[in-house]
């Protein structure tokens, strides 16, 4: 089942146990639209959404970023192996993300995608337990395909939160994972084409020779600067589904036990050693059984500075519904980065959920829960408008 949820700055999908109606009044400012189960009716000046008044069973649930259907279906099947998904949320998230790694989802998850400046693919991944607040993560993982499973081993077999680089690979070998090349003919061709085009775009600044026309090697500019003025818009990097894409997944059982996880091969043509938001708790994902969870995707270099997943969960802790929480998680970024691109999913512990996006044409995401009308698994889509930085907040 596919639902298109309108065009606006923020389009939010929310399931709830009981509703009457919602009215969103238009104004000269960009407006917020919300969509619920049920039919909508549009009139001049007002968008009225009739909600489903019946009580809907929302849990258990699996929700993930992007149209990664196979990952969601597998996670849902694993979650349902026990009644109500009890004690299966970790297995569901790890196996769901692992499925995407194996399928090389959009070539932005798993091996054979997003080569760095040297042509190598490295992986980042994280698993977070909302009951214990324990986290296992890996970053810059080399020569190991199973990033999310290595992250699980960090969680279950160490007292650390994150392992990185070659040392993370050595840990993976000790845990029984085999080393193998993450480079494929496709990723090699991608890198060769990039170098043939003078390494454009790249992530360097304030260096010489000019990084906008040269591959380097680079050195710092000799003139010291007190503040660097960026002369390259972030949207020049083509951030979106085919770059900076991450699978972020949340699984919740009927007792509101929550796990969240992420996996990615990072930004295409990144400087070697770069780590994005995906393996950072509070940035790529965050989970707390007392509140809910959130996962993010987009420009990780920017997002990790603001911890949007943590902001969304803390907004729900303060009593805000997922729709407002998702906005709040991204609004902080927009204060400083008007050319930012990204999306955020927020889910409360009861299974109510919302998605917010900015700067992309649209943001699809997958949901599996008993609330589906044509089966448990459905695709939902958010349409976004770039270049806007103000929204009207509607009380839900």
UniProtKB/Swiss-Prot annotation:
<protein>
    <recommendedName>
        <fullName>Putative N(4)-(beta-N-acetylglucosaminyl)-L-asparaginase GG24090</fullName>
        <ecNumber>3.5.1.26</ecNumber>
    </recommendedName>
</protein>
<keyword id="KW-0645">Protease</keyword>
<dbReference type="GO" id="GO:0006517">
    <property type="term" value="P:protein deglycosylation"/>
</dbReference>
<dbReference type="GO" id="GO:0008233">
    <property type="term" value="F:peptidase activity"/>
</dbReference>
<dbReference type="GO" id="GO:0003948">
    <property type="term" value="F:N4-(beta-N-acetylglucosaminyl)-L-asparaginase activity"/>
</dbReference>
<keyword id="KW-1015">Disulfide bond</keyword>
<dbReference type="InterPro" id="IPR029055">
    <property type="entry name" value="Ntn_hydrolases_N"/>
</dbReference>
<comment type="similarity">
    <text>Belongs to the Ntn-hydrolase family.</text>
</comment>
<dbReference type="InterPro" id="IPR000246">
    <property type="entry name" value="Peptidase_T2"/>
</dbReference>
<feature type="disulfide bond">
    <location>
        <begin position="199"/>
        <end position="215"/>
    </location>
</feature>
<feature type="active site" description="Nucleophile">
    <location>
        <position position="246"/>
    </location>
</feature>
<dbReference type="Pfam" id="PF01112">
    <property type="entry name" value="Asparaginase_2"/>
</dbReference>
<feature type="disulfide bond">
    <location>
        <begin position="100"/>
        <end position="105"/>
    </location>
</feature>
<dbReference type="GO" id="GO:0005764">
    <property type="term" value="C:lysosome"/>
</dbReference>
<keyword id="KW-0378">Hydrolase</keyword>
<keyword id="KW-0068">Autocatalytic cleavage</keyword>
<feature type="binding site">
    <location>
        <begin position="274"/>
        <end position="277"/>
    </location>
    <ligand>
        <name>substrate</name>
    </ligand>
</feature>
<feature type="disulfide bond">
    <location>
        <begin position="357"/>
        <end position="384"/>
    </location>
</feature>
<feature type="signal peptide">
    <location>
        <begin position="1"/>
        <end position="23"/>
    </location>
</feature>
<comment type="function">
    <text>Cleaves the GlcNAc-Asn bond which joins oligosaccharides to the peptide of asparagine-linked glycoproteins.</text>
</comment>
<comment type="subunit">
    <text>Heterotetramer of two alpha and two beta chains arranged as a dimer of alpha/beta heterodimers.</text>
</comment>
<dbReference type="GO" id="GO:0006508">
    <property type="term" value="P:proteolysis"/>
</dbReference>
<keyword id="KW-0732">Signal</keyword>
<feature type="binding site">
    <location>
        <begin position="297"/>
        <end position="300"/>
    </location>
    <ligand>
        <name>substrate</name>
    </ligand>
</feature>
